Amino acid sequence: MYNNALHGIYLTQITWMKSARAEPYLYYIVTEVEKRNLPIELALMPLIESDFNASAYSHKHASGLWQLTPAIAKYFKVQISPWYDGRQDVIDSTRAALNFMEYLHKRFDGDWYHAIAALNLGEGRVLRAISNIKNKANPLIFQLKTAQTNQSVRAKRTSCGTIIKKPKNAFPAILNSPTIAVLPVDCAVILDNRKQWQQLEIFKPMV
């Protein structure tokens, strides 16, 4: 069931989440989505999954902007070690997430609704629901079982649709230009103090 109140709350929260959080990543993500000719709405999936928090970590051990689980990360060759978690790297995680979305899109016969549902609920769960419907089982069973856990996701997704259709009413403007670059390093570097390493002159993008 669509919850208009939740939609309004999330639309307000999305504005509050501000461009400041999305700005370091959004240009890169949009560019990668466009390169693959995927729906531009997918660029806002990190808003739904993690509120554009690259360090987000869930109780199910999903992490990063796209909330990739260890199993999905491993399958799509994202490195996870005590020193480095590629799920928290916008480049590695975006590559894996878009590969995963393309796989799900193909797996569900080109149905983006099912593909995105599988991203949130799990591939097997959505496949079982589709099978139940095809076998004339009660399709409401799936809806009832997932309504509570998926309600907030649907509300956020609807709010994202509003943002795309009426951008002037939502996000403040973000510069349409690159904000990140790949930097060469010769050894392991601890980057916990972002203000400190951003000021280091030796960290300059490769031209």
Curated annotation (Swiss-Prot):
Name the Gene Ontology molecular function terms of this record: peptidoglycan lytic transglycosylase activity
Which SUPFAM superfamilies does this entry report, sorted A to Z?
Lysozyme-like
Q: Which GO terms describe its cellular component?
A: membrane
In terms of InterPro entries, this protein maps to: Lysozyme-like_dom_sf, Transglyc_AS, Transglycosylase_SLT_dom_1
Q: Where is the active site?
A: 49
Matching entries from Pfam families are given as: SLT
User: Quick one: a GO biological-process term for this protein?
Assistant: peptidoglycan metabolic process
Q: Where is this region: Slt-type domain?
A: 37-122
> Which PANTHER family has this protein been placed in?
MEMBRANE-BOUND LYTIC MUREIN TRANSGLYCOSYLASE C, SOLUBLE LYTIC MUREIN TRANSGLYCOSYLASE-RELATED
Q: Which family does it belong to?
A: Belongs to the transglycosylase Slt family.
UniProt-recorded name of the protein: Putative tributyltin chloride resistance protein
> Highest lineage ranks of the organism?
Bacteria, Pseudomonadati, Pseudomonadota, Gammaproteobacteria, Alteromonadales
